[in-house]
Structures are given as C-alpha cells and as structure tokens.
C-alpha cells in the first residue's frame, strides 16, 4: 500500500492568524515534515485508535523536548503551529492523538486544531492552556472520555498560574497513585495520564501516554523535560521520583467517521 507522506512546508506550518512569518525556531526539519505524513499512512491500517496511538507515539521516541513551541499571547496574534521535530508534554500528546485520528494530512491538521483549541478557533484565549480544561474540551468534543477507578476522590483546585487568564476553579475527580498502580489491568496502551500538581494554583505538572513493555511492565511514554527527549520510563519510578499523589486518565475515543476537513479560521 502506498504511504501518504505529502506534508509540505506550507501545509504543515500554515499561519492561521496574524499574517507574519513563523520564527525560525518554530520550523520543523525537512525530515520531520515527512515523518507525520508517513506515520499516518502506516498507522491507518491498524484497527483501533489505541493501537494507532501506541504505534505513532512509539515511532516518535527520541524526538527532542522543547518547551514553549506555540506562538501567541494575550496581545500577540495566535498562529497555528505544527511541530514534529520537538515537543513538550502536551504538544506531544495532542500531535500523536491528532495523527491517530487522521487518515491523511488534511484530517490531521483539522484534528489538531480541534484538540488544541475550543471549537477549533485559533485564538490564544481559545487555547486549552490548563490540562484539566484540555481534558474537559476533548471529552466534550468526543475525542476522549474520562476513565475512573474505585477509590478515586474529589479535589478542588483554584488555578491562576497562566498570566493573562482569570482564575479558574476546577472540580476534579482524581485517582490516588497507589490505586492507579494496583489497577494496571484496566489500562490500555495509548491512555493519557495526567499528573496532578502538588501546587495549590496549578492543576497538572505533566502528562503522557500509557505504554507497556513486552513483559507488561507499566510505562510512561512522554516528552521528558529533564531527559530532553521523548522516551519510555517505568511508571512506578516516575511516580516515586516526582512524589506524585494523584493522577487522572483519559481514553481516546474511536473516531466514528472521517474527521471533517474545515476551512482554516
């Protein structure tokens, strides 16, 4: 079967607001531009979205970690940026999820816009800045669903760590880490795990995908700031190293039909 790798520079880096050229640091490599298109073509033969997420995220291991790759601000026009040569933890999750939902690069771009922004509107104030809102938004648009476990508890957070946004009050249902590790059997490769912050004014400090080693050891597949790349590491060790008390889980929904390709806003 021929592989779709037609991801041109203009297509993958279309600027949807402002009209200015992207900064040089926001450009992917030429090899990176072709990589997402190739992975979409290979992954679309897999029957479930969990398998596609596992395949695509695994293929991106080794990619560089880089924070602050998105462009925009309260007083700066938002630009729709796609990076497949560098990720932070959230752009890694949303790029993989969009690619897993797509059958070609046009669907990928649409899916990524719908995942990153409320109603797919490319505007800084519509971007899902807090990961709890990212989850809420992507449950509402049927991209994901929340996964609970017996023993989960309620938590309320008042967050204000993002400059330019008003305070938000989040009522969260969170899973204690010990319960999470004890219920490995209910997890699937490709589930999205969010790590709840110990800070009072922040919802999460990190996110990544569930993965499994061949011996079924539970792994975290993520864009690691400390290790500066996308990698797998043992979940129990990550939880211990960062003294994680609570997590939340999202599971990607199987797309009911092709992602509708919308005209850029």
Model region roles, listed by residue range:
Residues 232:
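A short macromolecule-binding patch
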Residues 28-166, 170:
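N-terminal capping segments
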Residues 198-202, 226-228:
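Solvent-exposed loop/turn segments at secondary-structure junctions
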Residues 156-198:
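A mid-sequence, solvent-exposed acidic-amphipathic segment
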Residues 217-227, 236-265:
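Low-complexity, Gly/Ser/Thr/Pro-rich intrinsically disordered linker/tail segments
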Residues 201-221:
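Catalytic nucleophile-His microenvironment captured as a short glycine-rich beta-strand/loop
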Residues 1-11, 15-21:
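N-terminal secretory signal peptides
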């Amino acid at each position: 079967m021929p592989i779709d790798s037609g991801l041109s520079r203009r297509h993958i880096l279309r600027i949807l607001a402002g009209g200015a050229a992207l900064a040089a640091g926001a450009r992917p490599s030429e090899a990176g531009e072709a990589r997402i298109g190739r992975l979409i073509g290979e992954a679309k033969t897999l029957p479930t979205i969990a398998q596609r997420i596992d395949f695509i995220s695994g293929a991106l291991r080794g990619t560089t970690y880089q924070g602050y790759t998105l462009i925009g601000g309260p007083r700066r026009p938002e630009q729709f940026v796609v990076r497949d040569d560098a990720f932070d933890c959230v752009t890694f999750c949303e790029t993989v999820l969009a690619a897993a939902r797509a059958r070609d690069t046009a669907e990928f771009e649409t899916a990524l816009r719908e995942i990153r922004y409320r109603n797919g509107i490319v505007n800084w104030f519509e971007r899902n800045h807090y990961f709890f809102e990212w989850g809420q938004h992507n449950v509402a648009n049927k991209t994901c669903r929340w996964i609970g476990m017996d023993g989960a508890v309620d938590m309320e957070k008042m967050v204000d760590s993002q400059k330019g946004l008003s305070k938000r009050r989040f009522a969260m249902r969170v899973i204690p880490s010990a319960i999470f590790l004890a219920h490995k059997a209910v997890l699937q490769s490709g589930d999205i795990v969010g790590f709840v912050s110990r800070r009072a004014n922040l919802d999460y400090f990190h996110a990544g995908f569930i993965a499994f080693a061949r011996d079924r050891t539970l792994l975290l597949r993520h864009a690691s700031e400390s290790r500066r790349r996308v990698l797998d590491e043992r979940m129990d060790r990550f939880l211990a190293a960062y003294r994680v008390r609570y997590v939340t889980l999202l599971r990607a929904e199987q797309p009911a039909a092709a992602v509708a390709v919308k005209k850029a806003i």
